[in-house]
């Protein structure tokens, strides 16, 4: 992780109905080119199809982009994503292990907010990237942000949604379980007192899952491109579409 916090400030949604509609976009693996391909799939075309389908399904309050925007640290991938998302709907971004936060990623400051605040929910963005590593961790800055968000949500009687790139639980997949948040137990220990009002969403694992761990519901979301086979010992692809 970078020494200075990448994520700062709040984005506020104060004028909407009791229903909050968030769309998670994750692991786009864009290259900055319309011709970029990952494992045989054109990543711009697949990301565009997913985003367009989400927009067509109804109004969206905010996109939550949970990392691996770039396929391999390509600096133009971030403008490419911004173009796909458009300007009509706000979006908050996290880096993944394939993103280089030292380059152009950090220049997209409007998307790098720590929290999305609404009347009934707070959304907390936590950075799990560890520079030079595939797996993730939460440093003290991120853990402190978690503790502060729990305190504020409790004081204001709000539910709390936490977004990360790396998941905070086992995926029952040997090769992926080496890449989860290595100090997840510490984070979940802090969250335990607010477990019944909390939800964690993550990316990285290129598959859908829904589990309750330590009383906390945890979701992972498919990539907008290729999917990984669930519960596999070694790297394996699934034949599911995004």
Predicted regions and their residues:
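Active-site-proximal segments of metal-dependent phosphoesterases and phosphodiesterases across multiple
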Residues: 34-38, 156-198, 229
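Binuclear metal-dependent hydrolase catalytic cores centered on His/Asp/Glu-rich metal-binding motifs
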Residues: 118-159, 176-186
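Active-site neighborhood of phospho(di)ester-bond hydrolases with catalytic His/Asp-centered motifs
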Residues: 24-26, 62-68, 91-97, 126-127, ...
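Beta-strand-turn-beta hairpins that frame and shape the catalytic cleft
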Residues: 13-24, 115-125, 150-161, 212-218
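Metal-dependent catalytic neighborhoods of phosphoester/phosphodiester hydrolases
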Residues: 34-36, 65-86, 100-112, 173-175, ...
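Acidic/histidine-rich helix-loop elements
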Residues: 23-46, 71, 100-110, 131-140, ...
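N-terminal active-site segment of His-dependent metallophosphoesterases
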Residues: 1-80, 171
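Binuclear metal-dependent phosphoesterase catalytic core
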Residues: 2-7, 16, 25, 190, ...
């Amino acid at each position: 992780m970078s020494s200075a916090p990448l994520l700062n400030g709040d984005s506020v949604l104060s004028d909407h109905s009791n229903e909050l509609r968030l769309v998670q976009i994750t692991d786009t693996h864009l290259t900055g080119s319309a011709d970029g391909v990952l494992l045989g799939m054109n990543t711009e075309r697949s990301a565009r199809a997913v985003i367009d389908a989400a927009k067509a399904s109804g109004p969206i309050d905010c996109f939550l982009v949970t990392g691996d925007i770039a396929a391999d640290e390509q600096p133009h991938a971030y403008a490419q994503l911004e173009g796909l998302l458009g300007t009509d709907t706000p979006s908050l971004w996290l880096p993944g292990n394939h993103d280089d936060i030292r380059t152009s990623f950090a220049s997209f400051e409007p998307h790098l907010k720590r929290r999305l605040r609404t009347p009934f929910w707070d959304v907390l963005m936590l950075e799990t990237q560890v520079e030079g590593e595939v797996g993730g961790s939460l440093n003290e800055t991120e853990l402190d942000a978690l503790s502060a968000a729990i305190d504020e949500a409790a004081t204001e009687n709000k539910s709390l949604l936490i977004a990360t790139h790396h998941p905070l639980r086992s995926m029952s997949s040997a090769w992926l379980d080496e890449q989860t948040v290595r100090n997840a137990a510490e984070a979940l220990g802090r969250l335990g007192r607010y477990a019944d009002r909390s939800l964690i969403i993550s990316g990285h694992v290129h598959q859908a899952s829904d589990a309750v761990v330590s009383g906390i519901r945890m979701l992972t979301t498919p990539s907008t491109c290729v999917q990984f086979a669930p519960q596999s010992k070694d790297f394996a692809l699934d034949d599911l579409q995004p």
